[in-house]
Design a protein with these regions (language model features):
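Second-shell loop/turn segments in exported
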Residues: 88-91, 127-134, 167-170, 213-218
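Extracytoplasmic/secreted envelope proteins and their assembly/folding machinery
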Residues: 98, 102, 134, 138-145, ...
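Structural recognition of the beta-strand scaffold that forms the well-ordered cores
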Residues: 59-64, 87-92, 116-122, 156-161, ...
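Catalytic His-Asp segment of secreted/periplasmic serine-dependent ester chemistry enzymes
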Residues: 164-244
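N-terminal secretory targeting modules
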Residues: 1-63, 67-76, 80-81, 237-247
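Oxyanion-hole/transition-state-stabilizing segment in secreted/luminal serine hydrolases
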Residues: 69-84, 98-142, 147, 158, ...
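Central antiparallel beta-sheet cores of small beta-barrel/beta-sandwich binding domains
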Residues: 247-352
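Extracellular/periplasmic catalytic domains that process cell-envelope and extracellular macromolecules
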Residues: 53-57, 81-84, 111-114, 150-152, ...
Length: 352
């Protein structure tokens, strides 16, 4: 047998080996369906009850982790505005990774339903250094998409790029960028569409403002407003309904902030608000020449939220978390004051 023939056989053997290897299914943790314990199972079972109760009456589902679950918390008002009329169901569980979603999809979360659209945003909890590589994350997300396609043959899938996390660029963000670049290839415009809106949550410098993500991972109400707005056109097109047109009230200007003091008397303070879309900044003056910046400020519709941090002369801090609603050019709301582990909530108001 001559050398040329042997080399041909060797090349064919190598190609055959690589083909078999490429055909093998990955077996790492991100693609191995796995349940969790405790409250997770209780929420999973509640999902199963929900889908049973709404058989044939669900048009839109959201599949994900704590960021998706947060539609029931900080994102509740946004959800009601954008999805309350759309027969939508939230299937997000805090802490979930791709393997946990895979298990849920096999154990009742999709039983008997056929939504028009499934929004998927999963993977950030797989991105820790000791968890999965970028390639493994891609495998996990791909497995979730394939599972949805198989179990929901009539459903269009809107796959979202994993949202950025961390105040500034870091290794974890870098890994997420690699993953997003790869999973966009799952888009076929027939069953799967891909949408990356991560830039909507960042400043031009690449930093993430606390007004959008207070802990640089989970959204504030304003953050959920940005999320909903960014994908509304795509959602509306897929559902074949009228898009939601959201406008924010104008909070800009000089206000007089009023709150009841320790002696029962009303105390007035100047409040300055500057608004840029769903974000706000500004200051409040308390006492002579003591101005405090409005932190983590954001708005949604006619609702506003911000935080003020005040250093105490004897040490420590007072943290005031304010939420309010604009009614006939008057702001009314609640302020929660936190100090030394104790919390107090009282009413406040403001007028221009």
């Amino acid at each position: 047998m001559n050398r040329f023939f042997l080399s041909i056989l060797g090349s064919l053997a190598l190609v055959f080996t690589l083909t078999l290897k490429g055909a093998e299914k990955p077996t790492h943790s991100a693609v191995t369906p796995a349940p969790r314990e405790g409250g997770w199972m209780k929420r999973h079972e509640q999902f199963n009850q929900n889908v049973q109760a709404h058989q044939g009456d669900i048009d839109l589902i959201f599949v994900g982790d704590s960021i998706t679950q947060g539609w029931e918390g900080a994102g509740k008002a946004v959800w009601e505005t954008y999805y309350g009329h759309r027969k939508a169901l939230n299937l997000g569980i805090g802490g979930d990774r791709t393997q946990h979603v895979l298990w849920r999809l096999d154990h009742g979360n999709l039983e008997g339903i056929s939504p028009k659209v499934a929004v998927v945003m999963i993977g950030t909890n797989n991105s820790g250094d000791d968890r999965n590589t970028a390639d493994e994350m891609v495998d996990g997300i791909t497995a979730v998409v394939h599972k949805l396609k198989a179990k929901l043959p009539e459903t269009k899938i809107l796959l979202l790029g994993i949202f950025p996390r961390g105040e500034n660029f870091n290794d974890q963000r870098g890994k997420i960028l690699q993953v997003n670049q790869a999973i966009q290839k799952l888009q076929d415009w027939k069953r799967v569409q891909y949408l990356d809106i991560g830039h909507r949550f960042m400043e031009r410098s690449g930093s993430i403002p606390k007004a959008i993500m207070p802990d640089f991972l989970h959204f504030s109400t304003a953050g959920y407003g940005i999320w909903a707005s960014a994908m509304e056109k795509r959602i509306s097109t897929l559902l074949k309904d009228r898009p939601v047109e959201m406008t924010h009230a104008d909070f800009s200007g000089e206000w007089t902030f009023s709150i009841q003091g320790p002696n029962g008397q009303m105390v007035d303070s100047p409040l300055n608000i500057k608004q840029n879309g769903a974000r706000i900044r500004g200051s409040m003056t308390m006492g002579p020449d003591r101005s405090f910046a409005l932190e983590h400020g954001g708005i949604f519709g006619d609702q506003i939220a911000f935080t003020i941090t005040r250093d105490r002369p004897q040490g420590g801090q007072m943290i005031y978390q304010l939420k309010g609603t604009l009614k006939d050019q008057r702001l009314e709301g609640k302020v929660t004051a936190k100090m030394d582990g104790e919390t107090t909530t009282i009413d406040w108001s403001a007028k221009r």
